[in-house]
Design a protein with these regions (language model features):
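HotDog/MaoC-like acyl-thioester-processing domains
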Residues: 1-3, 71-74, 78-122
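Hot-dog-fold acyl-thioester-processing enzymes
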Residues: 1-56, 60, 119-122
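Intrinsically disordered, low-complexity segments enriched in polar/charged residues with Gly/Pro
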Residues: 49-56, 68-69, 81-85
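Generic hydrophobic-segment detector
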Residues: 62-63, 92
Length: 122
């Protein structure tokens, strides 16, 4: 891992996806937008599977949603390493979700504990 490393996922949520979320106990949406926790889950996926990846322990997250995401709207969620603290095995990341038009859906930060922090990157 190095400062500036980045991972992204492209995804859209259908009405069926939202209905399945509501069945799990989520809040019923207004019928047109994607519930914010579904978008936040994209960051959990990226952190646990891609960057830093398996073995990551999610410690903290803050998100600011700036506009709603419409169902079926194509979203691009990304995480980028902004700080490495190898002495504590911690990594700080920027989290960002935009639509295909480049409009910001949400922005935030994440703090994770990782197995192998590159000492040279800190």
């Amino acid at each position: 891992m190095n400062l500036g490393d980045r991972a992204e996922i492209r995804r859209s949520f259908t009405a069926s996806d939202v209905a399945a979320y509501v069945e799990l106990g989520g809040e019923p949406p207004d019928g047109r937008t994607v519930p914010e926790p579904m978008i936040a889950a994209l960051f959990s996926y990226l952190l646990g599977v891609r960057l830093p990846g398996p073995g990551t322990n999610y410690l903290k997250q803050s998100l600011n949603f700036t506009r709603p995401a419409a169902q079926a709207e194509k979203l691009i969620a990304s995480v980028a390493i902004t700080r490495l603290r190898p002495e504590k095995a911690l990594a700080d990341l920027e989290t960002l979700c935009r639509n295909e038009a480049g409009e910001e859906i949400c922005v935030g930060r994440a703090l994770v504990r990782v197995k192998d922090v590159d000492v040279a990157g800190g």
